[in-house]
């Protein structure tokens, strides 16, 4: 399914399908189920999206505020905007990979994997320990009161 303009209804659900959003808008409460692939290069998917055992690739446009993943879902962000205020809640078994774009908020519970590729990472204004040369990686645990900032690759 290709969406390049106009408005798709709220509550739209896809199962095991590929959807490409290059313009226009998909209303709130969008659901991608069981092996679906959602490719967003422009346009937007409204708030409260629910991604279940599926993949979202965001390289442009906007992906819904207050959205969540369940099961073995994967979120790949190389551009665009993820969330506005409440961002994304990554459920157990989920994976998120960030190499670009803007991430407003991310909640990642136990059993999740988050990879952020870039440089100049600071945690509450201090350099992240262990990131001294290109290719270094570090496991970082921080609270909701702390900010992680950096330049995404």
Descriptions of predicted regions:
Residues 1, 6, 10, 17-19, ...:
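The right-handed parallel beta-helix/beta-solenoid scaffold, focusing on the short coil/turn
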């Amino acid at each position: 399914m290709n969406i390049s303009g106009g408005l798709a209804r709220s509550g739209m659900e896809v199962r095991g399908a590929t959807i490409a959003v290059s313009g226009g808008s998909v209303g709130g409460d969008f659901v991608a189920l069981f092996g679906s692939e959602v490719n967003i290069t422009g346009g937007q998917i409204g708030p409260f999206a629910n991604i279940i055992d599926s993949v979202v690739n965001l390289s442009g446009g906007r992906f819904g505020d207050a959205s969540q993943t369940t099961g073995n879902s994967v979120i790949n962000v190389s551009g665009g905007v993820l969330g506005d205020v409440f961002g994304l809640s990554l459920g157990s078994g989920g994976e998120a990979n960030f190499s670009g774009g803007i991430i407003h908020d991310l909640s990642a519970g136990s059993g999740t994997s988050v990879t952020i590729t870039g440089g100049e990472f600071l945690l509450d204004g201090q350099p992240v320990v262990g990131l001294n040369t290109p290719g270094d990686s570090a496991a970082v645990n921080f609270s909701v009161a702390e900010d992680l900032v950096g330049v995404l690759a």
